[in-house]
Design a protein with these regions (language model features):
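A broad helix-preferring feature
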Residues: 2, 18-20
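Extracellular/lumenal and peripheral-membrane lipid-interaction modules
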Residues: 20-193
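Bacterial N-terminal signal peptides
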Residues: 7-17
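Positively charged n-region of N-terminal signal peptides that target proteins for export
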Residues: 1-7
Length: 193
């Protein structure tokens, strides 16, 4: 579920243009990201989008994630992202009992995914040719790294049945004619074509 959360969060960052621009003006960062999202949406509707880069900085992205404009799946709270060259690190507090609701497993390896945990996820992410790509490098629960094969079991059991396009490696269409997305130091740069 952490993988799903990271994937979802990464998609939010890269796909910020897909979000609606609400009137919640609780911070300058949120107001700024809402203006940029509105620009991306409007630019994406034109016959020839302006290819000038749109840069979303980390403070804007995190203000957006903390706002009521993003609805995370049940059990996922306090999401925060940090960007570096080509990589994203995400943190969240996750109640796995809520995340796994309705799906049970007798596999003892999956028992670590129960209760409330602080989750850290590191991933590589980029967009090219209108497609977004995410590869989850590692997931830790309360500072303890989850072995990759256990993470894969979790994804197969709890993520893929509900979200078949999300996994350790994910590929998805970028919205609003976004052609490329580059994660940089504390920012993501989006170019439309």
């Amino acid at each position: 579920m952490k993988v799903f959360r990271l994937r979802f969060l990464l998609c939010v960052v890269i796909l910020a243009a897909a979000a609606s621009a609400a009137n919640n003006k609780t911070s300058p960062e949120l107001a700024s990201v809402n203006r940029k999202i509105a620009h991306l949406e409007a630019n994406g509707r034109t016959p020839r989008p302006n290819p000038a880069p749109t840069v979303l900085n980390e403070a804007e992205i995190n203000a957006y994630l903390a706002s009521d404009q993003v609805q995370f799946p049940a059990g996922v709270n306090s999401v925060h992202l940090t960007g570096s060259q080509g990589t994203i690190s995400g943190t969240a507090k996750v109640d796995f009992d809520q995340v796994r609701a309705g799906i049970h497993s007798s596999n003892p390896l999956l028992s670590i995914f129960s209760g409330v945990h602080n989750v850290d996820v590191d991933a590589h992410a980029y967009g090219r040719g209108g497609q977004g790509y995410v590869h989850v490098d590692s997931v830790s629960l309360d500072g303890v790294e989850v072995p990759n094969f256990v993470l894969q079991l979790f994804v197969e059991k709890y993520i893929e049945p509900r979200n078949p396009n999300i996994g350790i490696d994910s590929r998805f269409k970028l919205p609003d004619r976004i052609d490329s997305a580059a994660v940089g130091q504390h920012q993501v740069t989006l170019i439309q074509k």
